Regions:
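Proteolytic maturation boundary segments
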Residues: 1-89
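M16 family metallopeptidases and their MPP-like homologs
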Residues: 1, 70-103, 107-159, 170-178
Length: 178
């Protein structure tokens, strides 16, 4: 496993590089954000086998982990300093987030039942955990169709700061899970 210092060194190494947008295999990911409609993956780092760190052109940092299960799933985990992304039992916040995230994607405004159906059809699930000023947001999506996951996760995260301890424990947890 990489130490927090090693991850920091990797971040510094990539910080000043101008790289071509990383194209997810078989799919060109254009992430829809109101302020930045062309947000794209700007750099890719392999942290471990089946574990990849992506930096988006809008500043968000994302970890991708392919599951080892029979049906390949993509775990998309982001660290954001945008505050609490907690969702009440009725999931109004999640519905509002989904409505924003998928606007312009053909999904349109979603009712609670429509959101459940959209999530089921696209095999997307979402959870969040708050730690201090950071929010860990985890989305599970199909490996062969990751875009709905990015649509759901990307709206709130326009800039991210990495808390070294959270990043390290998150990375270790992902490696343990693999």
């Amino acid at each position: 496993a990489l130490s927090p210092a090693a991850i920091l060194a990797l971040e510094k190494e990539y910080a000043n590089k101008k790289l071509a947008a990383y194209i997810f295999p078989g799919r060109n990911l254009s992430l829809t954000v109101d302020a930045d409609p062309q947000a794209e993956i700007s750099s890719k780092e392999t942290l471990a086998e089946n574990l990849t760190s992506l930096t988006l052109s809008n500043g968000a940092r994302v970890i991708l982990a392919k599951s080892a299960g029979e049906e390949q799933k993509l775990q998309i985990t982001a660290v954001s300093n945008k505050g609490d992304l907690s969702f009440p039992a009725q999931q109004k916040s999640l519905i509002a987030l989904a409505n924003k995230a998928v606007s312009g994607s053909g999904v349109g405004e979603l009712s609670s039942s429509s959101l459940k159906r959209w999530s089921a059809e696209n095999s997307v699930t979402m959870s969040s955990k708050v730690s201090g000023m950071n929010t860990l947001l985890s989305v599970s999506a199909r490996t062969n169709n990751p875009e709905p996951g990015f649509q759901l996760i990307n709206q709130r995260i326009t800039h991210s700061t990495i808390n070294d301890n959270i990043w390290a424990s998150l990375q270790n947890a992902q490696i343990q899970a693999l």
